[in-house]
Amino acid sequence: VKLGESKQRQAVGAFVHPKTGRIYYALYPDQVVYEYDFENKTTTKIATHPRVKETLRMVVHPTGKYAYLLRQYNERGNGYISRMDYNSTTDQFSTPYIVAGSASGSGYRDGVGSRAQLNGPTQGVFVKNPEYAGEEDEYDFYFCDERNHCIRILTPTGRVVTFAGRGNDSSDPGFANGALRS
């Protein structure tokens, strides 16, 4: 299977669409997103992430309606989560767009959309929330905010809240609240 067109090819994120069975993956450093169709054995370039030279992690929604791309690492130190929407009529994903955090900086702050600050979102999972029963989207997205040392939630409305841990907006080791009591 040919991975892509660039000379330096590293797959940095991938997922299998729950409805079509196709695999989608992003390559470093150009951040092109490809689709591989197991039936036809074809590779197709479907989108280009708006930022390059970033390590992305990809997680598809359980319904396949969209996928999140988590910006885990880059040389500029920004922190965000972008999203690609799936169109079942055209059978294609949209160009990724940022839904939480910012491409121009990082930090620690709960909030909605670009008002939230993230610093190294890496791994995540969708969790069905019974409070959303009957809503269009019934899932929260729990993710690790690595350099803020916490677990956070991205709601379907784009709100980021801290679930566990406390961000200290620092790469210093130790506890945000000071040393442990002896």
Where on the chain are the PLM-derived regions?
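Short loop/turn segments immediately following beta-strands, especially the blade-tip
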Residues: F38, R83-D91
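Conserved beta-strand positions in repeat-built beta-propeller and related beta-rich domains
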Residues: H17, I23-P29, H61, A67-G77, ...
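Hydrophobic core register within WD40 beta-propeller blades
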Residues: A14, M58, G124-V125
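Gly/Pro-rich loop segments of beta-rich domains
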Residues: V1-V12, N40-E54, D91-T122, R159-S182
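A short loop-to-beta-strand structural motif that recurs across blades of beta-propeller domains
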Residues: Q31-Y34, G79-S82, H149-R152, R159
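Structural signal for glycine-centered tight turns and loop->strand junctions in beta-sheet-rich domains
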Residues: T20-G21, T42, G64-Y66, T122, ...
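Intrinsically disordered, low-complexity Ser/Thr- and acidic-rich flexible linkers and loops
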Residues: E75-R76, P130-E138
